[in-house]
Amino acid sequence: VPEVRGGAARARGVRVLAATGALAGLLAGCGIRATQVPTDFGPAPSMVPCELSATDITTQTTPSGLPVEVFLLCSGALVRVNRSVEVAEGTEEARRRAVVAQGLLDALSADPSAIEDEAGYGTAVPPGLTVSGPAPGDPEDALRLSTAPDALARFALAQIVCTFADSAAAGDNGSVVLGSTSAETLRRYECAPETQSAPGDGNPPSTEVGGS
């Protein structure tokens, strides 16, 4: 089971439901029928799962940098959130692509904010990942990770693929060419609808491409 950081609201909801089910089972075993009358367990949660208000988004906005979107996990699916990436003016295009990719990767591997955590957002992307541009002989839009894509958890790979594929780091065409810095193999991954809706069901669709 991959480690997903964040999503406190979702985790609490699962624990409450599990405890309620266990209690109902115990009552039934004692010959006591569970009540159908609504019970007051206190105020409802203040955050709607997987939704951030305009106020919440405003309080998180970084005043500088290139506005970008990354995909976090929420309720078992990929959901877009706003971030920003710092890119120095005048950065050469090939270098700019790698800088944006690293900024996106850093944003994905960072713990969600307190507001996002409360709303159920989480991430499976491990900290410490790095990304570089194409090696000699690679397609110009290739990106190479410090960890092989197929060695990442499915949730993490789905987050990375969909975030990169939807950004200037990969040409914003719905796919991204990924490999590792320790192997020659490259694959073009697609951010398919099923990848966004059920990232844990399998790796994103991919095809092998020529590399260095």
Predicted feature descriptions by range:
Residues 1-212:
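Bimodal "functional hotspot" detector
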